[in-house]
Amino acid sequence: CPGGGYTMTSDREAEPIAMQYLAKGYHAVILRYSVEPARYPLALLQLAKTVAFLRKHAEEFHINTDKIILQGFSAGGHLAASLGVFWKKSFIAETLGVTSEMVKPNGMILSYPVITSGEFAHTGSFECLLGDDYNDADKRKEQSLELQVSADTPQTFLWHTVTDDC
């Protein structure tokens, strides 16, 4: 999932990254998810639908369903992490007509993700994601994904370096 502050999806975090994975023998899929004016949970549902599609077509595409790993950059990291922490939410499976296990990622690589909606938030990303709901403190807190981690969250490699200006 490329980043872009939920306003766009970055080209530099899409095909160049996928090509590196392909060169190493991995499958790679780029999700160009919906951004502003789209609102939560549309992008999350699109990512969940993509994971379910890959699981459904695993034999056809020669995918090891034990190794479906999400990678997301910046706001795309928030999106990937969202599926990682929310995959068991019933609204996802019900909306897509699948089981929760079909949308569960096996792991995540979160690359300088937008994670917190608290003190150190990249507020622009959350304003674009939530729209008018940004003013609802409970909805902002729900999107502060460091508060949503549970025993059901897949294993995660998370990395940051310098400030990400989105």
Regions found by a protein language model. Give the residues of each.
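Active-site glycine-rich loops that stabilize anionic/oxyanionic intermediates
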Residues: P2-T7, V162
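Acidic catalytic loop of the alpha/beta-hydrolase fold
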Residues: T116-S117, T163-C166
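Alpha/beta-hydrolase active-site loop signature
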Residues: G5, V35, I115
